[in-house]
Structures are given as structure tokens and as C-alpha cells.
Amino acid sequence: MVHQLIAEFMGTALMIIFGVGVHCSSVLKGTKYRGSGHIFAITTWGFGISVALFIFGNVCINPAMVLAQCLLGNIAWSLFIPYSVAEVLGGVVGSVIVWIMYADHFKASTDEISPITIRNLFCTAPAVRNLPRNFFVELFDTFIFISGILAISEIKTPGIVPIGVGLLVWAIGMGLGGPTGFAMNLARDMGPRIAHAILPIANKADSDWQYGIIVPGIAPFVGAAIAAWFMHGFFGIN
């Protein structure tokens, strides 16, 4: 169990280092890749998740996936909270590492980039704030995400899961990510949001806990539960 918890922690941290890192790289003043845009960012998220899965193997790196696996009987319910806590902590630590790496660029951006934009480097935010619709978008995105991963995992070709999941993230990000930023993962959003709240970032906005708890905090669990029940009931996947 300890080994798996460490793997969940480290895998999530690495995912966040890639993900939050690419946002910092494309937004902060003075970076080599500033202005690279959303395709650059979404592609890095996809590749970064693939790399994390290649390195750490059979990890969830997502509390919503942990819930789905518990519902399917693949992970004991007693492990749901420990796995989820390890993943959120990984998100916090990964974000802190990125902040240290980009500290000079954060400092240079203080008077040029808005506090809201700085917050959005760490955590997701809606393009249009409408909490019921935002909730539905994250629920649906997560339903597609978890359903896709469960289907991909049925293919036994070595190496197909990390590659397939990376492509799935890329497709969801490009096609469905526009309204909310496709968190689909409490650890992906809450970990960096906590880091944003505690780090000594100059001129920062509040961390918008209302949105963080309601939308990326709760909706992915609902989407994952529906995905688990659908994939098991319709396709017989466990």
C-alpha cells in the first residue's frame, strides 16, 4: 500500500509539473515559449500524462478514477481516501516545484499579468461563469474521460494505455475543454489551487474556492460514477 501511495503522489506531482509548467511557460513574462497558445498547452498535458503513466505504471493519479475503480471492485473502498489524499498532495507539491522553477518569471510578471491570470496558471476557471452549466461540462468531460480510459484498458497491447490516455486527454482538451478548462480531476485542480493559496505570490487574487469545490471538486466524481456504471452495465467492463 505504501508503495502505491507513493506512486500516486509522485505520478500526480509529475503530471502537474508538466501541466502547470506549460501554462507558466506560455504565459509568464520572459519565458522562451511565451505566447505558444492552447494547442501547445493541451498537447503538453496529454504527453505529460502519458509520461507519468509510463513511469509509474498502474496508477490512477485522479480521485475520480479511484472512485470508478472502487465502484468496479478493483480497489478497496478503504483505499479511496488515502489514494485521493496522496494525489491531492502530489498536486500541491508539483505546483510548488513549478513555482520555484519559474520564480524569476513570476516576479517579472507582477505588474504585467493580472492576478486572475496568475491564478489560472494553477487551477481551472470557466470561460463563462455559470455554475450549473460549468458543473455539467465537467461531469460530461469526466464521463467521457473515465469511459475512454476503461475502454482503452481492455486492450492488452503493452504500452497502449499511456499512449491512448494521452490521446484521449488531447481530444477532450481540444474538443470539450473550452468552457471550463477540462479539470476532470480533483487533484489536478485542488492541489494547484491549494498551492496558489499558500505560496507567497505577489499581487495574487483569491483562490476562488466556491468554483473549485463545486465544479472541479464534485462534478468529476459524479461523471466518474456514471462512467463506471455505464461501462460495466453496457459493456461488462470491470
Curated annotation (Swiss-Prot):
Write out the entry's keywords from A to Z. Answer: Cell membrane, Membrane, Transmembrane, Transmembrane helix, Transport
- Family matches, as Pfam families: MIP
Which InterPro entries does this entry report, sorted A to Z?
Aquaporin-like, MIP, MIP/AQP_LacticAcid_Trans, MIP/Aquaporin
Cited Gene3D superfamilies:
Glycerol uptake facilitator protein
- What did gene disruption experiments reveal? Cells lacking this gene show a decreased lactate transport ability. Deletion of this gene does not affect lactate racemase activity.
Q: How does the protein's chain sit in the membrane according to the entry? A: Multi-pass membrane protein
Which molecular function GO terms apply here? glycerol channel activity
Residue ranges annotated as motif NPA 1:
62-64
> Key word Transmembrane present in the record?
yes
* Record GO cellular component, one term: plasma membrane
Is-annotated flag, keyword Amino-acid biosynthesis? no
Q: Where are the transmembrane segments?
A: 2-22, 39-59, 80-100, 135-155, 158-178, 211-231
Describe what upregulates or represses it: Induced by L-lactate and repressed by D-lactate. Is thus regulated by the L-lactate/D-lactate ratio. Makes part of the lar operon (larABCDE).
Task: Quote the subcellular location field of this record.
Answer: Cell membrane
User: What stretch of residues is annotated with the motif NPA 2?
Assistant: 185-187
Which family does the record assign?
Belongs to the MIP/aquaporin (TC 1.A.8) family.
Question: Could you tell me what this protein does?
Answer: Transporter that facilitates the transmembrane diffusion of D/L-lactic acid. Is involved in the cellular racemization of lactate and lactate metabolism. The transported molecule is indeed lactic acid and not the lactate anion, in agreement with the assumption that, with very few exceptions, MIPs (major intrinsic proteins) only facilitate the transport of uncharged solutes. Also facilitates urea and H(2)O(2) diffusion across membranes, but is not permeable to water, glycerol and dihydroxyacetone.
What name does UniProt use for this protein? D/L-lactic acid transporter
What taxonomic lineage is listed for the species of origin?
Bacteria, Bacillati, Bacillota, Bacilli, Lactobacillales
Gene name tied to this protein: larD
